[in-house]
Structure formats: structure tokens, C-alpha cells
Regions:
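Phosphate/NTP-binding elements of NTP-utilizing enzymes
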Residues: 1-244
Length: 244
């Protein structure tokens, strides 16, 4: 879910791949639906460099280009523009993919993860995302693969899945479910803020799906729900032809 430290973790991984993996002229790329979104993780990484004397001596920050250069090995961490899905020829050592659920199609994902790192000894593709509402998307495809591996239906030793989220059958109003979905609840996000958001969603059905998606990391069928399905189901009753 939102505000659980995903960007900070991704920034640390990007810096490790760029500066600490022993790879000469490593190419590490930050990807998202647009350059602005991809810059979020980059900006966190740049701040980490500035706060670390050892890194700040060795890493050149080119803010205007959204590029970090680790000078001892000539390695780079580069934010890519949104149209990179039309380009090829990357020699990728690492990719940090932010908010995968916002990808409009699978083109960028395929370009960056299918073969671009084959010439590297140990390429890593690090994907972070909140749940979305498009079950035909590349993000949902990856989400289902992750669940299948976690639950033992599939085996892929190259894929390490981590999912924090509520199950479809969980009570979305239960604070225990909030904690299950938000590992840093009470640290980066105060429980009172989640409680207030939940109460608002109870009073305004149109907010329920946003709460489920953004606070509980649940995949929903639409961004806005006009009526909770349990209330819709209660409207079912027999109708005779005479009544019609």
C-alpha cells in the first residue's frame, strides 16, 4: 500500500546495483508510466547520496538529466522517458520499476526485462507497486504469478515475490487487516489516518474501492464503487409477472 517505504527501498536497491555490485559500467534504469513518476525513486536515491559522505565523493548527480554516475566503475542509474518502450539496445544490469499498475500496456516492461540483461552476470529487476483495477494488465499478470509462487502452484527460482495486502474475504474495516496490509502502520503511517479514511469510506461508498486499493493493496474491479456489493445483493427478491 501507499507510504510503506517502497520508494526508499527501491532507491537503496538502485544504489546497490549502481555502486556496490562490482559490475563495471553497470546500467541501472528507473522506469514508470512517465518520467515524473520514475523520478520519485531517483530523487530519494540522490538524497541518499548527498547524505552519505562516502557516496557523495564517488557519485556525480546530474539532476537535470535524472542520472547518477558512479565514477569508480563508470556505472549509471538513469531515469528513462515514457517513450522508451519503442527503443532497444539496453545492456541492463538493473531495473527499478515503480507503480507497475499504472503501465498502459506491457511494451515497456517487455523491453526492459526480456533479454536486456542477458549479457550481465546477475541482472536484477525490482518491481514495486500498489494494486490496480485492471485485471488484464501486465501488473495483474505479475501479481497473479507472485501469488501462484507464494501458494505453491508455480515454481520460479528467479522470481522472489513479496505481497502485503488484504485478502478478498478479509473485513476491510478491521484494524487487524490494516496491520496485515501495512507493515509500517504506526511508523510511517499513523493508524488514526487509516481509521479516518476507513470511516470516510463507510459514509461514502464511492470511496470504498480507493480505500481497499490504496490502503489495503486489494485489486478492485473499478476505481469507484457506487454501491457496496453486499448491499446490492440484499436488493435481490422474487418478482412476479403480474407485478411487472
Amino acid at each position: 500500500p501507499k507510504k510503506q517505504g517502497k520508494s526508499e527501498l527501491a532507491a537503496a536497491v538502485a544504489l546497490l546495483l549502481t555502486c556496490g555490485d562490482g559490475e563495471e559500467r553497470a546500467e541501472v534504469y528507473g522506469c514508470a508510466a512517465d518520467r515524473q513518476q520514475a523520478s520519485i525513486v531517483f530523487n530519494v536515491a540522490a538524497d541518499m547520496v548527498r547524505m552519505c559522505p562516502a557516496l557523495s565523493k564517488r557519485v556525480k548527480i546530474l539532476d537535470s538529466q535524472k542520472r547518477l554516475i558512479y565514477q569508480p566503475t563508470g556505472s549509471i542509474y538513469q531515469v528513462l522517458s515514457a517513450d522508451v518502450g519503442n527503443k532497444h539496445g539496453f545492456n541492463t544490469h538493473g531495473v527499478v520499476f515503480d507503480e507497475l499498475h499504472t503501465q498502459p500496456n506491457r511494451k515497456l516492461f517487455d523491453v526492459m526485462t526480456k533479454g536486456s540483461g542477458d549479457a550481465r552476470m546477475q541482472p536484477l529487476y525490482f518491481l514495486i507497486t500498489t494494486a490496480g483495477n485492471d485485471t488484464k494488465s501486465i501488473c495483474y499478470e505479475i501479481h497473479q504469478k507472485a501469488k501462484d509462487i507464494i501458494e505453491g502452484r508455480k515454481i520460479d527460482h528467479t522470481f522472489y515475490p513479496v505481497i502485503y495486502g488484504a485478502e478478498e474475504s478479509d473485513d476491510w474495516t478491521d484494524p487487524k487487516v490494516w496491520k496485515k496490509a501495512n507493515p509500517s502502520l504506526g511508523i510511517t503511517v499513523g493508524i488514526d489516518k487509516v481509521k479516518d479514511a476507513c470511516e470516510s469510506a463507510k459514509q461514502n461508498p464511492g470511496e470504498e474501492n480507493a480505500f481497499r486499493q490504496l490502503r489495503l493493496n486489494q485489486w478492485v474491479k473499478q476505481a469507484v464503487r457506487w454501491m457496496p456489493m453486499d448491499k446490492w445483493d440484499k436488493c435481490e427478491f422474487a418478482v412476479s409477472e403480474d407485478d411487472l
